[in-house]
Swiss-Prot record:
Keyword Metal-binding applies: yes
The protein's name in its UniProt record: Bifunctional enzyme IspD/IspF
Gene3D superfamilies in the record: 2-C-methyl-D-erythritol 2,4-cyclodiphosphate synthase, Spore Coat Polysaccharide Biosynthesis Protein SpsA, Chain A
Catalytic activity entry: 2-C-methyl-D-erythritol 4-phosphate + CTP + H(+) = 4-CDP-2-C-methyl-D-erythritol + diphosphate; 4-CDP-2-C-methyl-D-erythritol 2-phosphate = 2-C-methyl-D-erythritol 2,4-cyclic diphosphate + CMP
One Pfam family in the UniProt entry: YgbB
Entry function: Bifunctional enzyme that catalyzes the formation of 4-diphosphocytidyl-2-C-methyl-D-erythritol from CTP and 2-C-methyl-D-erythritol 4-phosphate (MEP) (IspD), and catalyzes the conversion of 4-diphosphocytidyl-2-C-methyl-D-erythritol 2-phosphate (CDP-ME2P) to 2-C-methyl-D-erythritol 2,4-cyclodiphosphate (ME-CPP) with a corresponding release of cytidine 5-monophosphate (CMP) (IspF).
Organism of origin: Brucella abortus (strain 2308)
Family affiliation: In the N-terminal section; belongs to the IspD/TarI cytidylyltransferase family. IspD subfamily.
Length: 390
């Protein structure tokens, strides 16, 4: 279940808490892996918020044949019902319902839950309550101490025979009962027997921002993390021809000549497009925009760079830095650097301190030294989800 908004944990640039990074990996990706790694698990329905499809693709870029995406509803209870309905054609014998923000579910607990399932009873992992419990009045004053005997804190995944728990959810939906706090409560309401087994202290739910911080710290302490940071390089060159300006990084700069090319010949953006594509092993600019294709005749090169950035982001990549070096005797780049930097910021959606634009001459050597054209070298650094594989 991953359709919640996570108000208590707060929002971040990564989205709701199930998409926050812990140990360089999204919470939901880690949770999902526990189930995809379990040979006892068949089809997995991941229920997400209708607005979160792009977030999910970024968090879980790899494809799993046994994973289906389901759009959730306005409440957890309704999202669970929709997830169960998505499995109706398969009609599994049993189903496990798990919180997407419990990323530390272990294989041992999964196996014990499944081993205790029968056609006659569900299974609820839980921990015996160890804290002293108090009942308070409306004014906050203690009324009484509650005995801990027989009290348990419920965890997930909660497991049930599929048909009875789906029927229970459908009955609750039909009469608009929305007050159940978990699936075991719905099972109790419909008199489905539920067996409690010992849960795991590690199987905590990430509810607050502090929980996410602690989970991230825990993972980083448990093992060395090698984040998937990739660097791509690009190089391009264009010759001069008669004209009155050149376009560099999307900025028109007055000059006694223009650059010759099929598009607008923006040598800087062409090199940077190749650099971004290189971080995904996605070919080069000619692969995506062949110069033989007439539709790109005179095209603005920002189309190319924005296309490359989209490919990066669809794979969950975050552009950490771009660096462009222009090699030219003229025109002078310095007076236009700020405008060029801002143009790249706008195209890539990154801050100015992540953009570097430099220029150098070729000391009057070669075609650049003879003022026959301009060359550009670009480097892009992109951080992708997950770690570098061993």
């Amino acid at each position: 279940m991953a359709a919640g908004r996570g108000e208590r944990a707060g929002q971040s640039a990564e989205g709701p808490k199930q998409y926050r990074l812990i140990g360089a990996e999204a919470v939901l990706a880690r949770t999902l892996r526990a189930f995809t790694d379990c040979p006892l698990i068949g089809t997995i329905a991941v229920v997400i918020h209708p607005d979160d499809h792009a977030l999910y693709r970024r968090a879980v870029p790899e494809k799993h044949e046994n994973v289906i995406l389901v759009t959730g509803g306005p409440t957890r209870q309704e999202s669970t019902r929709l997830g169960l309905l998505a499995l109706k054609d398969e009609a599994p014998q049993y189903v496990l319902i798990h919180d997407g923000v419990r990323p530390f579910i272990g294989q041992d607990l999964l196996e014990r839950i499944i081993a205790n399932l029968t056609p006659d009873n569900g299974v609820l992992p839980a921990l015996a309550v160890s804290d002293t419990l108090k009942r308070a009045a409306a004014d906050g004053m203690v009324e009484t101490t509650i005995s801990r005997t027989g009290l348990f804190a419920a965890q997930t995944p909660q497991a049930f025979p599929y048909a009875p728990i789906l029927d229970a959810h459908e009955k609750a939906f039909a009469i608009n009962r929305t007050d159940f706090t978990d699936d075991a409560a719905i099972a109790e309401w419909q008199e489905i027997a539920v067996r409690i087994i010992e849960g795991s202290a590690d199987n905590t739910k990430l509810t607050w921002a502090k929980d996410i911080e602690m989970a991230d710290k825990r993972l980083r302490q448990d093992h060395a993390v090698f984040p998937d940071i990739r660097t791509g390089n690009g190089y391009d060159v264009h010759s001069f021809e008669p004209g009155d300006h050149v376009t560099l990084c999307g900025v028109k700069i007055p000059h006694e000549a223009k650059l010759n090319g099929h598009s607008d010949a923006d040598v800087a953006l062409h090199a940077l497009t190749d650099a971004l594509l290189a971080t995904r092993g996605a070919g080069d600019i000619g692969t995506h925009f062949p110069p033989s294709d007439p539709q790109w005749k005179g095209a603005a090169s920002r189309i190319f760079i924005e296309h490359a950035a989209k490919i990066v982001r669809e794979a969950g990549g975050r552009i950490a830095n771009v660096d462009v070096t222009l090699i030219s005797e003229a025109p002078k780049i310095g007076p236009h650097r700020a405008a060029m930097t801002q143009a790249l910021c706008d195209m890539l959606g990154i801050a100015a301190d992540r953009v570097s634009i430099k220029a150098t001459t070729n000391e009057k050597l070669g075609f650049v030294g003879r003022r026959e054209g301009i060359a550009a070298i670009a480097t892009a650094t992109v951080i992708y989800p997950g770690e570098v594989p061993e």
